[in-house]
Amino acid sequence: MIKRLIGKLIGQKPAKASNPLRISVEEHDIDIRHISPCATRIISTLNQSGHEAYVVGGAVRDLLMGYTPKDFDVVTDATPEQVRRVFRNSRIIGRRFRLVHVYCGGDLVEVSTFRAPHETSNTQDPKGRVLRDNTFGSINEDAIRRDFTVNALFYDMRTEEVLDFCGGYEDTRQSVLRIIGAPAQRLSLIHI
């Protein structure tokens, strides 16, 4: 039983994402009204400013599994500086992984930019820990940079579709936690 669990955990998915599986509103159980008004406003404003923006990660996973998310993260093609210009009540944080905290009312939403594979030359310390990770990329590249398939799900509020680049939708339905890519490499990047 333990071997099977470990096998499921370290099971590899392709490290190349191409066109996503698009799960329509008729196929998934996400009710758009369950997404925080703050995240909804941020995504809508970014879309109106000409940017792509999605709910991403744990919130999408939780909504698909019937849970109430503890927070909502947004990912976009806008750089942190562009996000900051769109939202006056925001602030860029982080050196290693720059993102933007956008405040609305008493809520806080983290807005990150799509990430691309990073260069290892001078971005890691001698122990292999990532020091800087601000290489921006596409939604496809961002998906394969995430830790688990169930955290690489994107919710498009315009179409109400879930975009799945790594098999995370099926993994949520099967209650499987699967690492994306090579487990040893991926786990070395996760800092708890």
Residues of each region from the PLM?
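Catalytic cores of the polymerase beta-like nucleotidyltransferase superfamily
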Residues: 1-189
